[in-house]
Structure formats: C-alpha cells, structure tokens
C-alpha cells in the first residue's frame, strides 16, 4: 500500500495491520511503516488478543464490566494458570475440606440410627467409628495408588474408562456427578444447622440461608482457584485448631476423672427404642448405623481427582495432602465419637442442635470458645461444599472434551475457572437443598452411594491395569487396589440395603438415566462430526450458486432500503415481500413502492387475520418448493439508540428470525440499522 490511493485500486484483504510506504530523507530511500491495531499484538504468525480487546465499547457494557470485575476480579491470561496451582496447605483447605468437615456430623448420623434401639445402643458408636476409619485407611491407600498411576488426574471416570471400558466409566462419572451435587447440598445444610445450634431462630430459614451460602461459594469459585483457596483456607485451619483444643481439653478432663454432665438437647431421643438389637433386626440396625456413619468417607476421592490443580511435583504434593487429610479426619472423628459416648451425649431428634454443639456445650458451656468452635464448624461445613465446586466442573470439562456433555462445560472463563460447570452445580444443588427442606438427615440416604460406586469401579480398574502392565511391584499394588475394591464394594452393598427404603433407590434410577443422557449427547456429537468433517483437504470447494433472496419489508424506509441494497449485492434473484392487513394499506404500499427508484420485484400478501409471521413463513415454504436453490432471508433490523427505546418497537424481525432458526435450506441475514438522534436522514418518498 502506498500514500497515493487511486479509486481504481484493487480490493484489499482486510487485516489488523496497515502498511504504508514512506519516503526517507535521501533520494530513493523508502521504508514501510506498520500500524498495529489496538487490543492485539503479534506473536509469530498469530494475533494475540490483549485485555484491552475485552473491554466493551458502549456505556452499558462498561458499567457491566466494572461490576463483573468487582465481583469476580480482572480476567486472567492462560499463562497465569501456573500461578493458580494449589500448595499443600491450600490444597488441604480446598480439596480436603469435604472429608474433614464430615467429622462434624458423621457420628451424629450413626447415633441417630442406633437411637431407634434406645440410648443403650450407643455403646456401638465407637466400634462403628473405628470400622469407618479402617475403611478410610484402605481408601486413602488405594487413592494414593490412583495418584501414582494417573499423575495427570486420576478421577474415577478416567481410571474406569481407561481400564474397564466406556460404559463402566460413564457409570462412575454419573455416580460422581450425583455425589458432587449432594456434597454441596449436604455440607451447606450441615453448616446452617451448626449455626442454628447457637441461634435457634435461624432454623426456620435453613433453606434461604443455605441458598445464600451456595451463591457465595459460586461467586468465590468464579473468581478462580487461588482466590477460592485464600478465602477458604482460614476457616479450615481454625476448625482444625479449635477441635484439636476441644479434644485435648476433653481428654484431660476425662483423664483426671472430671466427667462433665451431658448437655440436654431440645428434643432428646427416648431411653427405650422402637426395635431390639437382638437377632437379624439388630444386625441390620447396626449395618444401617455404619452406612450412615460412612458418610465420613465422602470427599476422600477429591484429591486424586484434582492432582492437576496441585503445585509441582503434583503427585508428591497430592499424596502428602491425601495422607494429612485422612489423619486429620480420623483424629477428629474418633475423638468426638469417644467424647460423645463417654459423656453420654444424646442427639437432638428435632435437628435444631448438633451433636458437635452438645459435646462442646457439655465441656465448656456457653462460652466464647463454644462460639469459636460452632462458628468455625458452621463456616467449614458450608465451605466444604467447595469440594463439589472443585470436582464437578473439572469432571464435567473432561466429559465435555470426550463429547459426553455439552461443550460449554469445557470452556474456561476469564478467571480460568470452568464457569458453566460452577453455575450449573450451584443451580442443581440449590434445587436439591430446597427439595429436602435443608435437612441433613433427609439428604444423607442419597449420599455416599455415588462415591462408593465410583470407588469400587476405579479400584477394580486399577487391579486390571496392574495385571496388564506388570510393572515392578505390580502384585503388591494390585493387592492394595483389590482390597480397596472389595471393601468399598461391601460398603456400597451395605449402604444400598440399609438405605434403600429411605431414598437410596432413587440413585439406582438416576445413574442409568444420566448414563443414557451422556450416551445420547455423545451420539449427537458423533453424528454431527460425521456430517461436518472434511475427509480430503485437497478437494476444491464447489462454487456456490446465487441464492434466492427474500426481503420482508414492513414499511418503506431507510432500514428497508439498506437491507434491499445488501440483498442485491449477493444475488440477482431478489424478491421483496410485504404483508398488509387490509386492501387499502396494500394499495397504498404498492403505490409508494412503484414511485421508489431502488425497487426490486415485490409480492404483497394481504392478511385479513392480521397475522404477520405465519403468512411470511408459508410464503417462504412455497417459494422453496418451487426452486432448488437455497433461500436467503434478509431482515431489516431497526436498532434504537437506548435500551428502553427497544421496548417501544414490535420486533417483528426478531420473531421472524427465531421462527426461521431451525428451518433447513434457509440462510438468515440480519442487516441492522442504528438510529442516531443527532442525524435524521431523509426517508424514501
């Protein structure tokens, strides 16, 4: 390009760079100056969009952008992803909070079942807790093998699909998706219940408060992984420290013979039970109590699923975090269980006050330390739902990349978070929380089944992997995973049998339905891929035939004139069509049309029923039947200056565009005309 631009210059290919040839100071000295577009920079042969390119141009967009940045923070480039990794402390807070926080309610859920046989059955509480911790030890050992075998992320879906096939992998994925939703719902409900323990008036608003917690978690996660870790690390460690102090104080009092009297709940269970512990009924009751207490095992898979989010070396840091998580949970869970049984604490039948609150109140009374323990417990339980917000979007993105979920789930937002998955999880878990009225006891029967099903499948898959690869020490590794598969499989059966009538059967129905949905999505994407794929890149593209262009014209004005001019630029076969509601208006429009110099052939449709869009659609259908060429509908769209002015117009073009959206063999082109108050051009006469 030179300084002199002639009218006969050949059309240039548009570019973000403008090159001008300049004359130097010396004769014959010429150079090229390159003018770069703002908002983009060159890197190699690519244009890289800078943050400036994301800023909206209009005032309303700028206001929205400011609000969004206040809520979610400024956008992060892909290069900043490395800085979003989790250290061991923040990884324990984000990925381990679900498992650690379940120590606050696992004992109570087991005791609620034992209470059906009377408070004398509470002697089985500690043995059940020991059994749960034993299973957890096996699960932690098995999950460490998952981290070792899949250092790039060993979610149950990936492990199972890789070793057992697609269908078992989808079963594991469906189970985990359900488990993540329930993690958010159960943790939030438990957190609100912990608050209502020292503020009973809140019990009537558990659903509303829970929904607020979920919304705050959603916003926190939309801000990105690192900021979520900073937000959530504090409550996790305050909870651990306060519970450690409480346990030490409780053990000291017991060791010195100073056993405190048990605090009374608002509505205690009776001393006499409804069933007996003798015979098969008693054995089934103990199994049900173990099934309820095994809720403490949930969340132990989150670290193995989130290995890629850890700092390097990822496998080592993930393993350390996993072991610390298991030790922390076991210590708090066994300690609270022993104190509750020794002191003689009875759960609250009304679910107003938690067992954690009763034990704390028995030891320290209503003191500042009591509020510290309950406050940190409440916050951690609510924030433990963050495990779901970490796992669900990541799993959904993997499924989306494998074309088993909508592709929107694979896209990262401006803060490097899987925004679509985060919002979807918040909505679904909020609905589940509201449907069960925020009750932890009503939600527990649906819980744990998904995670144990995924555990069993992934551990079975690893056994097959070690047998196939036969690496050094494969027998020991296969033995560990085989033990994990057997133990988690037995727990799964126990939970299903014990909780079947209470709602576990719904999970057995939901998992196949979700798998069927995932397969249907995959089938659609596969069919679409087969239809769109270009098999040979060296084939020439066929020259398209000019289409039939139909221009609906409501009134003869500048917007219509611009649409017709565009239509004539893409095809010689242009037909305007006008729908009139009476013969008089039809004749008036035809008279104006014949006086207009830019006219094209016109058809007028009289619609005595005053309907505009259906006659146009039938007209387009009839034209399509008579001609094999594709049809292009060019719509004149009037765009007002302000948003409120948009409400003053009928938006017929928008309704017609929506009606034509799924019509085959039809191209819809929108030609917008922006109205400017400062310049009112002359209209066609």
Where does each model-flagged region fall?
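Cytosolic C-terminal regulatory domains/tails of membrane transporters and channels
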Residues: 1-81, 527-685
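Extracellular loop-to-transmembrane helix junctions
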Residues: 111-161, 167-170, 186-214, 326-330, ...
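Loop-to-transmembrane helix boundary motifs in multi-pass membrane proteins
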Residues: 166, 204-211, 309-331, 400-434, ...
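Membrane-interface loop-to-helix entry segments
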Residues: 217, 222-256, 321-325, 444-456, ...
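Helix-loop-helix junctions that connect adjacent transmembrane segments
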Residues: 237, 244-296, 498, 502, ...
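Hydrophobic alpha-helical segments and their helix-loop junctions in multi-pass secondary transporters
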Residues: 240-270, 337-344, 456-471, 520-529
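Extracellular/periplasmic helix-exit of transmembrane alpha-helices
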Residues: 251-261, 322-357
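C-terminal membrane-solvent junction of multi-pass transporters and transport-like membrane proteins
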Residues: 266, 408-419, 455-492, 497-500, ...
